[in-house]
Design a protein with these regions (language model features):
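Acidic and generally charged, gly/proline-rich low-complexity regions
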Residues: 2-154
Length: 154
């Protein structure tokens, strides 16, 4: 009788991955323009239960601070359609917001929070994933109860 195999505990690969090696990053700003391709947008649409994701892009600036924390700033935008919670019709939306995230290595994991920003996100193997960070920001910005324009409020 074969032994049951242990579950693979690795994280699934993100649908939209844009890795940035911050371990070799100096103090100079690193500018990054990222845009999801059609395959990535389709996978993200499935993940976030969207009818469609026509565009997801970001213009980012990464800078390592004196304390070793990497600050990511910029702006993201998306063109998408969610399903109306009443009629199930597509509800188009354009979303976007400023980005201000902080990433710190294992040495910073037990550090105090960064003023008003909270704790920095972890850096794994000296790399951060700018695409996944922006995808998560979009996910948080989605309307939890989208309604078609002609549907009255409850």
């Amino acid at each position: 009788v074969p032994k049951p195999r242990a579950k693979d505990r690795r994280k699934p690969a993100p649908e939209w991955s844009r890795l940035v090696d911050v371990s070799r990053m100096g103090r100079l700003e690193h500018r990054l323009e990222i845009k999801a391709n059609a395959e990535e947008r389709a996978a993200l649409a499935r993940r976030f239960d969207l009818v469609a994701l026509g565009e997801l892009a970001a213009a980012l600036v990464l800078k390592k601070r004196g304390d070793g924390v990497v600050e990511m700033t910029g702006r993201w935008h998306a063109r998408l359609a969610q399903r109306c919670v009443v009629t199930l019709e597509p509800v188009p939306a354009e979303l976007g917001d400023d980005v201000r995230l902080f990433f710190g290595g294992a040495a910073n994991a037990s550090a105090d929070p960064l003023d008003d920003e909270g704790w920095p996100e972890p850096v794994e193997d000296g790399v951060i994933d700018a695409g996944e960070a922006v995808a998560q920001l979009m996910g948080v910005a989605l309307d939890p109860y989208p309604r078609a324009p002609d549907v009255p409020a409850p």
